[in-house]
UniProtKB/Swiss-Prot annotation:
The gene is rplA. Belongs to the universal ribosomal protein uL1 family. This is Large ribosomal subunit protein uL1. NCBIfam families: rplA_bact (TIGR01169). Binds directly to 23S rRNA. The L1 stalk is quite mobile in the ribosome, and is involved in E site tRNA release. Protein L1 is also a translational repressor protein, it controls the translation of the L11 operon by binding to its mRNA. PANTHER family: 54S RIBOSOMAL PROTEIN L1, MITOCHONDRIAL, LARGE RIBOSOMAL SUBUNIT PROTEIN UL1M. The lineage of its organism: Bacteria, Pseudomonadati, Pseudomonadota, Betaproteobacteria, Burkholderiales. It comes from Burkholderia ambifaria (strain MC40-6). HAMAP family: Ribosomal_uL1_B. CDD domains: Ribosomal_L1 (cd00403).
Amino acid sequence: MAKISKRRQAFAAKVDRQKLYAIEDALALVKECASAKFDESIDVAVQLGIDAKKSDQVVRGSVVLPAGTGKSVRVAVFAQGEKAEQARAAGAEIVGMEDLAEQIKAGQMDFDIVIASPDTMRIVGTLGQILGPRGLMPNPKVGTVTPDVATAVKNAKAGQVQFRVDKAGIIHATIGRASFEAAALRSNLSALIEALQKAKPATSKGVYLRKVALSSTMGVGLRVDQATLAAQ
């Protein structure tokens, strides 16, 4: 633990908390700080100019990161008949109906995301207290309740991430791994920012994207100069 603390202190000394870093410099520094023995995730926190307490200003959605997430995802799908076959063909590890619901009730949840065809919500709806707290409840706003389950499965496998603003008005998301090239991380960040812009509530006033910060799993956070995000 002492070693981790010393390393963190060393990296913290390199970071100016008051400075806005150009995106290229920010990514380079975050990657440098990610020196743990595992492939650290690169995370972003975006402070939004919204009132998260108001239901009409809750920002939620999903985006497929062009360079993926660097994580293997196991997908469970509620579907039957032709849609079930399409889900399997698209790469879903688990496909079912009542049988899948019973597995979930029994605590057997060997998956990272749940997708449901609209006609299965009578079954899925009974699982809200189990899936909801785990962030696994299918929702049309993030594309996990859809008649096109095959595309939803492909998107999940391709690196789709879901986002939802927290009570403090902040979006937290992972945009890749420390092993990614800086260009790949930047591409993923740009895709996320674009998705957040599209999800801007009509009732949001003033500056919408207030702050953008990057960090690695074990590293320190640093702020990004948003003016450099648009530059290519």
